[in-house]
Amino acid sequence: GCSLKDMPNGSTTYNGLQNPSQIKGTWQRYQNKETSSDVLTCYGYGDGGGGPTEEMLEQSRRMEEGVAGVPRVHQTFAKDFFHILEDNMDRKCLPSWCGELYLEFHRGTYTSQAKNKKYNRACEFLMGDAEFYSVLAKVMGAKYEYPAKDLEKNWKLLLINQFHDILPGSSIKDVYEDSAVQYEEIIQSAGRIVNESQSAVLSVLEEENKKECLAVFNPLSFGRTSVAELSGEEAVMAEEYRNGSCPENISVQKTPDGSTLFLIKDAPSKGIGVYEYSSSVRAEEEPVITSLMTDERGWPVSFDTPFFHMEFDGQGEICGIRDLREDRELLKKGAVGNELLVYEDRPMEFDAWNIDAGYREKKWKFGGVMEFYLEENGPVRGCLFIRRRFMDSVLEQKICFYPHTSRIDFKTKADWNESQLLLRTSFPLDIQSSEADFEIQFGNVKRPVHKNTTWDQARFEVCAHKWMDLSEYGYGAAILNDCKYGCDIHDSVMSLTLIKSGIFPDPQADQGLHEFTYSLYPHRGDFRRGGVIREAYDLNCPLIIQRENGIKTESWSFLRIAEENIFTDTVNNAEEGDDL
């Protein structure tokens, strides 16, 4: 055993050993002794370790009899403890905390094992789609049985992979090999459910008319104008579409890789729109990018879009973004946007878990431009292509502009072959605000963007889901993403962490190919008035388009929501019964 003189401060940890040291440490760290002399302590091997043991139960029994210098313990249920606490309160007020309980530790878990996090985001959206389209088929009267067992199996498999060492990126290599196989199982199963339920929906709309149509599925709870893509054999009719047979409220564009892009106007909310081809010849539509100027190498220097005047420096970096709607420059004077920086990332401990406060002290530009040119330009989108090299890694980006939204997409492929280096992108913006908004689960949280206190300084890396936003009165900008979670906004600089390649516990973490998209979205008003939430959902959940024959040309919505501040995220069958 141990004597109390050997443990003057006790011990506390998430592995509760239920010994005198543990109990003493819990009592010493308890801050509200004047309010109640009872405190709840949990015991057992945590961190996936198996829970309480026989030895712990015996130690607890002995401590109930009393150990000198150690508070007396009593076995009870958590519910009973709160009843005791309520009785002891005697109208006293317990202190409360309003705001975020920020953990000043393990900031790297927002980014480590990026492929796993991308799988998770994709599967969450895909499972939501599978549930909704299954409901849609049922509500529209199709001969389709709601696949409750398959959906439950997929959700449970997805939740297993949200275990606290898998999703954060702090497991060994074998775990991620198994996890990738399981995510692919979910994608295959949920993808099959989506295809079968959509086919069932289309069967309800069948008619003898054999005219060719485009069927557009929108799983989101708001009507939207957005881009949909057909690839492979489905895209072979691009030339026919461009020659005027496409429906009048749809623009079309062929991409260099043979896919066909469609700009769908006003796709119905949580439903399907069917559009018949038009026989009239349409006028040539203006491309998104105009007034393009290039240097002697053919690299873009400046151009206009419906929303911006863009300028690039001799290194292929964005040095000007003038918002034509507001006639204002978005970037800080002398700064560059989408600045890709590589930082040395060697935390003092817990390599995959941590990012240390001094990581910014050693950094390099992800320079070495190999190619930079206008890759595609049409009525649906205009895209620049740029390829860069840093040491043994290559990064390719398509920077895409659109006619219907001020969102600028950075579609990224990175062949990453570095260790203990961290990649971030930054946008220094000419927007003044003392706080910013970050998305959390089904909500958002405000955080300061200054460094007044040590608490503020400690928030050099925070968590966000699909978006973060910096707005002043009447104007702002958001950074959106399709699979990233670590970010930071300080002194009007918005930064998103893209890759963190630690070497423990997985020596090959984050090596190889990465594909992801992040976006800059300047907007009027704050994030609510500027439509940031909808734009982030649109990035993560694109429209689905199919070529069909012999179906009714009509639109059908499961629901419509008039208020922009209300969003229906999930529609599914009840767990029991046949209700929704």
Where in this protein do the model-derived segments appear?
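Catalytic grooves of carbohydrate-active enzymes
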Residues: 1-205, 219, 473-546
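C-terminal (or distal) subdomains of carbohydrate-active enzymes
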Residues: 10-19, 69, 184-191, 195, ...
